Amino acid sequence: MVKRDAPWRLMAGTSKVSRSANFSPREGMGPKFNKAAAWVNRPMYRKPRIYRTMRGPDIPKGCEGPCKVQSYEQRHDISHLGKVMCISDVTRGNGITHRVGKRFCVKSVYILGKIWMDENIKLKNHTNSVMFWLVRDRRPYGTPMDFGQVFNMFDNEPSTATIKNDLRDRYQVMHRFYAKVTGGQYASNEQALVRRFWKVNNHVVYNHQEAGKYENHTENALLLYMACTHASNPVYATLKIRIYFYDSITN
């Protein structure tokens, strides 16, 4: 039941002093209680069940934070025969760049850098396309297979490369792209920028070893294959490859 206002509330020049009033000189400095903010940031046990069972889109299913990162910075000499590197090499440890246990999930891959030619090659009149394949190896063993062992090509041309039929159950091309450079005296484009960001959600499994090597993978290794289309003029790629991953709950 609502109380009526006291008569002195209606009298001019007078006011009732509230018991909850704060006359401290630091009153304006402290944080004020916001009812709406407290409701939004309420603890998980006071939320409905769907909030406890559903996970945000940032964290993959079966994983937990924080989001960790591993970088691979290297200059690559890319030839017509192709090159491969493993980008899921993560050492076991306690840091922000290490995995906690055997299992983790690579949420996304970020590739940035440039493709360029040296002083002798860029003077020749030619066009060279550098092609990249992000491949998932479902059953890694030993050392990474070479470009020619994994891909089937017509007339040894990397632009026609597809996974061999007997390896399609093991290797899966997740993404592919290319960058083009042109040499010559006039209409030359001696370097090309590379910038790609992919969401992959690849669950990697290691064995009991701590070292981050391809030979210690047991499931779902991430490989980056590179090859150029020109047979006699190689190119260089200065790349910084970053993977963002989460540790698995089952570790």
Curated annotation (Swiss-Prot):
Q: Tell me how this protein assembles.
A: Homomultimer. Binds to single-stranded and double-stranded viral DNA. Interacts (via nuclear localization signals) with host importin alpha-1a.
- Renumbered to this chain, motif Bipartite nuclear localization signal spans 3-20, 195-242
Q: Where is this motif: Nuclear localization signal?
A: 35-49
Please provide the record's keywords in A-Z order: Capsid protein, DNA-binding, Host nucleus, Host-virus interaction, Metal-binding, T=1 icosahedral capsid protein, Viral penetration into host nucleus, Virion, Virus entry into host cell, Zinc, Zinc-finger
Record's function text: Encapsidates the viral DNA into characteristic twinned ('geminate') particles. Binds the genomic viral ssDNA and shuttles it into and out of the cell nucleus. The CP of bipartite geminiviruses is not required for cell-to-cell or systemic movement.
Q: What is one Gene Ontology biological process annotated in the Swiss-Prot or TrEMBL record?
A: viral penetration into host nucleus
**Family according to the record:** Belongs to the geminiviridae capsid protein family.
**What protein name is recorded for this chain?**
Capsid protein
Q: Where are the zinc fingers (unnamed)?
A: 63-80
What is the annotated localization of this protein? Virion; Host nucleus
Per the annotation, the residue ranges of the short sequence motif Nuclear export signal are 96-117
Example of a GO cellular component annotation carried by this entry: host cell nucleus
One GO MF annotation is: DNA binding
Main subcellular location = virion
